Regions:
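N-terminal active-site segment of His-dependent metallophosphoesterases
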Residues: 1-20, 118
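Active-site glycine-centered loops adjacent to acidic/histidine catalytic or metal-binding residues
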Residues: 7-8, 43-44, 112, 147-148
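Short acidic, glycine-rich surface-loop motifs adjacent to enzyme active sites
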Residues: 101-118
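Short active-site segment of divalent metal-dependent hydrolases/proteases
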Residues: 10-11, 46, 115, 151
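A contiguous binding-surface segment within folded domains or other stable secondary-structure elements
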Residues: 119-131
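Short, catalytically relevant binding-site loops at active-site mouths
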Residues: 80-81, 113-117, 149-152
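Extended active-site neighborhood of metal-dependent phosphoesterases/phosphodiesterases
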Residues: 15-106, 128-143, 155-188
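Residue-level marker for buried hydrophobic side chains located in beta-strands
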Residues: 3-5, 40, 109, 145
Length: 189
């Protein structure tokens, strides 16, 4: 029905012209997918250097909601702010949206960084993510998907399930398994 990319659509560059070139290339590649709808979330490589300006030009609002087949989807932007946070404005927006949802509504949240403190030393957290989780807690059927860590991970915060999947490229080590976060060597197997 749809595909959603959970961020890091491009690799970081300080050159605004190069950033736009890379986003154009990614948008053109994604447009070739044989699916009706493609949705995007910014990753820090797409948004942190210009507070999400180029991302918005190419892909639209970095946070939004949509409903599909009885599920309410919420897309959060926890990368455009260089402080790795959602911010008070977005948290108020989330609170307003959640007020419209029944307590037992099926809710799926997408974000780039994990909303909980997975490993803050490697920037694997959202500084005010606990506030978002607190807003989600009254709802009994919530699942969160995130990118950023480039590996499969599953975590529960109360009754809220959080999941990430492996990246197709740029594999990262398990949190804390080495002193510095750096890509793992390529394994041709």
């Amino acid at each position: 029905d749809f595909v959603i990319f959970t961020g890091d659509l491009t690799h970081t560059t300080d050159d605004p012209k190069e950033r736009r070139k890379r986003m154009t290339e990614f948008r053109d590649i994604a447009a070739q997918l044989k699916v009706k709808t493609v949705r995007f979330i910014p990753g820090e490589h797409d948004a942190s250097l210009d507070n999400g300006k180029a991302f918005k030009e190419f892909f639209g609002a970095p946070n939004y909601t949509f409903d599909h087949k009885g599920v309410h989807f919420i897309v959060l932007d926890n990368v455009s702010d260089p402080g790795a946070q959602l911010g008070e404005v977005q948290l108020a927006w989330l609170a307003d949206d959640l007020k419209k949802q029944a307590q037992d509504a099926r809710i799926v949240v997408f974000a780039h960084r994990p909303l909980f403190d997975l490993y803050p030393q490697w920037d694997w957290a959202t500084r005010d993510g606990a506030k978002a989780i607190e807003l989600l807690m009254p709802h009994t059927n919530v699942t969160v998907f995130y990118g950023h860590i480039h590996q499969e991970h599953h975590q529960m915060t109360g009754h809220i399930a959080h999941h990430s999947a492996k990246s197709l490229i740029f594999p990262l080590p398990v949190a804390g398994s080495q002193p510095k976060r750096s890509p793992l060597p390529w394994d041709p197997a």
